[in-house]
Design a protein with these regions (language model features):
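RNA/tRNA-interacting regions in translation and RNA-turnover enzymes
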Residues: 1-237
Length: 237
């Protein structure tokens, strides 16, 4: 097996293992085996950089430290969600919606408390990710988003241009681990997982963001070229 074949084999193996671990929560490879194959891939790519694939797992971490985040205009505005604080408010919303729409159907989903972002794919490749900002203009945090293992770098069978919206969050275990490390270093503790997630995603050094254990929950299709949906539920499917 030549170097190119081995690089392709390792890339595919590690991508599949990462997908099963981070997305399906069904690991099929021991951590030590993953680390061993990852190091082998790093060494081969270092010796043959021209053979490294754009979707290689090693491309997730290692971007240069930024001096600042570039501003990004959202192709489709990321609207804010309206809160309700009582059953009366909820019933009022339901009554108004049914009166306006008739036999309305509702999609009920958990609300993840994190930082809203837009992920853009062109020809199946992840090209850019940005924070919500004011809904119209956000910040380019592509390099930090690449470190989140549950975000695929490539998609099969995707529209030529696809933009989805998700919520970046920090799982409780990652939050507890981060605060323990902060305490050991004599640094201030984070008040809650949401603050920790927001601060981690806005690190100018992607290597720091990569150590924070961030995750994402994608909940909306903002744009899908050539695809029409009859409703929100269908877009989720």
């Amino acid at each position: 097996m030549d170097s190119k074949e081995r690089i392709d084999q390792l890339t595919d193996q590690l991508k599949e293992a990462g997908y099963r671990y981070y997305v399906l929560d069904d690991p099929t490879m021991e951590d030590y085996e993953y680390d061993r194959l990852y190091r082998e891939l790093e060494e081969l790519e270092s010796a043959h950089p021209e053979l490294a694939r754009a979707d290689s797992p090693t491309k997730r971490v290692g971007g240069e430290v930024l001096s600042q985040f570039e501003k990004v205009s959202h192709s489709v505005p990321l609207m804010s969600l309206q809160d309700v604080f009582s059953m009366e408010e909820l019933n009022d919303f339901l009554e108004k919606t049914i009166a306006a729409e008739g036999n309305a159907e509702f999609s009920v989903e958990p609300k993840i408390d994190g930082l809203s972002v837009a992920l853009e794919y062109v020809d199946g490749k992840f090209v850019r990710g940005a924070t919500r900002g004011d809904g119209t203009v956000g910040e380019d945090v592509t390099e930090n988003l690449k470190t989140i293992r549950s975000i695929p770098m490539t998609l099969t069978g995707a529209p030529s241009r696809l933009i989805v919206r998700g919520e970046v969050f920090m799982p409780k275990k990652s939050f507890e681990k981060l605060n323990l490390r902060q305490e050991e270093l004599g640094k201030p503790l984070f008040a809650n997982p949401r603050n920790a997630a927001a601060g981690s995603l806005r690190q100018l050094d992607p290597k720091i963001a990569a150590k924070r254990g961030l995750d994402i929950y994608v909940f909306n299709v903002q744009l899908a070229d050539g695809v029409e949906f009859t409703g929100h539920t269908q877009s989720l499917e």
